[in-house]
Amino acid sequence: MKYIAIVHKNEGTAYGVTLPDFPGCFSAADTLDDVQANAQEAVELYAHGEAFTPPEPMPFEQAAALEEAQDGVLMLVDICFDFLDERVVPVNISMPAYMRDRIGKAAKAAGLTRSAYLVQAARAYGA
């Protein structure tokens, strides 16, 4: 869903990003190109651990009238809510046997199952 992000920039600082549809949810970005990814991450952290239903996006005019929008730039960010589906599903993958063994050893050393280890690795690489 597309939401409004209010972006502010002061000289010598990162871009400040406020997401008014998510009260108290904010982020920062070094470049305007980073706003989308950082807004996504902020919403995921905002929703973590709670029963969360994505809000309906406020109209552009309503966001533009907010006090926090003054002297800011309004941008549309596309927030993906697939992270809310935490069902565990079986997956069949192919890899060299030695890599399966290395992953198994590393997972055991970390106190994880192979599946949990691979999920953590995927998250660490930005999935």
Where are these regions (language model features)?
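Short, charged, surface-exposed hinge/linker loops at domain edges
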Residues: 1-2, 44-108, 115-124
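Structural detector for hydrophobic anchor residues on beta-strands
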Residues: 3, 15, 25-27
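Short aromatic-glycine-(Arg/Gly/Cys) micro-motifs in beta-strand/loop hairpins
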Residues: 7-22
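A short, exposed loop/beta-hairpin motif centered on an aromatic-Gly-Thr core
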Residues: 23-33
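Short N-terminal micro-motifs specific to bacterial/archaeal maturation
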Residues: 26, 108-109
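A short, charged, amphipathic alpha-helix used as a generic interaction element across diverse proteins
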Residues: 31-51
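Structural motif detector for alpha-helix initiation sites
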Residues: 32, 114-115
